[in-house]
């Protein structure tokens, strides 16, 4: 009977669905595994990146389910966001209709691949029920001071007409549409992620050896903790008159280089710069250039060529009394430290580049034979008055102490991470549950009024926020004073939704109507045991999710410190050496692969072609090869004895049979390591292929039966449909359980030993594994007799199971 993928796969998908085979059990005393792949945006079709992500997760979920764990393996859709609005403009379709039509199609595609997702816990973040509890979290955070409003410069995308978080600006462009981003002053809501900066940094230690080092490093750098000195510099008298300011604050991590300061660099937004601008004390050319800098995103400023302009004013060095020129510079950010940087060109590369460009003084204060700039924190101070000849660290501590003693500075800790702006001027998002009242100011909605849902009678034009233009939706009554008021028309950044969906999945779906998170079930299921997704989410999603976990813990919703215990970042799927994309014309449609070869072939290829963390190059020939392997497995199984296993006696097997059985059990042993630790599915599949090849040389019915019993067990998480089909036919699926190794299979009948004389290999021989040490040494001498002739043996060394070494003279 020929292998018919479509019939087999549809049959088993129906059986699994009807029997709710993949739903988590209610028994919370069972050992648990929560396996989660990052949920998709419902763009309309799944791509090979999705297939890879979900195949890895599904293999792990199926494995743990099979060996007796209570497994939660959910799926949902990150369904708010700009693409739905863009589609509404392009195709004249409502964002909601576009989104839910896509969800319906993608669900069909995902389940056609045999993924063992829980259907009962499926959700979309645009569902009103999800919005209700998200708005509840927002209000609770607002009441605790974790969300606040402020007017600030924001990253503004002219194309999408919305605000972007710093993390969403890539090389000065919108991460979503690629349009140039400008700086714009706007009011908005901010999440106080900085309140958790220290904990977010400290808890990265808990994730070492469980998360990729690259992700940990990226988060550590993004949080950007720095300890240093914050101090005041007085302005000279003329500068005080010009700026209407008497002093400015500066932060430095290198107090030891304080005597090397040759200029102070200010952010364009600094109060002193703004005062000069407001009094028209800067010429038009400088004014125009400052405006250009102000329109750059923080990342652009950091990466572009260093530029600056002398402001014509001076500060007084707090220790030496020297006059220091003040410059405005594009590399200084207003919200890091005080928006002012003390520049030490001799010992900082950026400062050196700037000073060289503008011919500013370069004062060396650390002794070195190396070329400047010398940036090491090693060496003795010079040109630093009473601190000369101190090493850098000692000098740093003493200088800080002197500033504190004089009450002109203090030790401080700064973080590079900024609070998260979550206001978005778009329609298709979760409405921010706040009210603007002329009498009361900003007031939260009452919890009983949630969810605040979107009106459906809107015109999506791409110009501004449709909620602002709606004739009635904004109108409401202030819950505090009872007067007429207006709803907030901004919606939430979609990363707000994806920052807690994993906890919602962990909550018993029977409680979803009543509460955001069910305490009992989230305590049992959280944290996620294995999280799978792309490295591109290292800073954005993963950092926000970690913050949310801690914030919800402190609000009493959760108990764990971290949301994801282990993280796997899978590599991209490439074709012709490039990421698959429509513009490159190198997209492979998963539907076509399933139709031609079946879902199991797609899954097998995906897991066999490369280790999960590495990039995967699409190869049509390798897909054909995967299909041929499944056909071969299916054909071979037709001749396997059905029913209960016939007991095998190891001592009754011949050499070839023992070797084949060893290969089968080696594959089983490897499966434990692969599923629990390395995820190197390619090596596991190769081990199964090797075992089947060895088995083909044997004619032992009982051995073949045992081998298929084990191999179908190993491969079921990878190619589930065909393994269920064959296992039901042969063993009534009794092989789908935790299998044990048989130690006697690994005991070798003979040993292959090498013989070395004075460390040089001279011979090899085979001997019974039951031979005594004396017998082995005697056999070794016999095999090396010609090298021993006329010599005396000084020492005999036997390294058990490996070699004999004879020392002669």
Curated annotation (Swiss-Prot):
Catalysed reactions, as listed in the record: tRNA(Leu) + L-leucine + ATP = L-leucyl-tRNA(Leu) + AMP + diphosphate
Family the UniProt entry places it in: Belongs to the class-I aminoacyl-tRNA synthetase family.
Name recorded for this polypeptide: Leucine--tRNA ligase
Keyword Cytoplasm found: yes
Stored Pfam families: Anticodon_1, tRNA-synt_1_2, tRNA-synt_1g
GO MF: aminoacyl-tRNA deacylase activity; ATP binding; leucine-tRNA ligase activity
Localisation: Cytoplasm
Chain coiled-coil ranges: none
Residues the record lists as binding ATP: 582
GO CC annotation: cytosol
Biological processes per GO annotation: leucyl-tRNA aminoacylation
EC identifiers of the protein: 6.1.1.4
Keywords: Aminoacyl-tRNA synthetase, ATP-binding, Cytoplasm, Ligase, Nucleotide-binding, Protein biosynthesis
Gene3D superfamilies: 3.10.20.590, HUPs (3.40.50.620), Isoleucyl-tRNA Synthetase, Domain 1 (1.10.730.10)
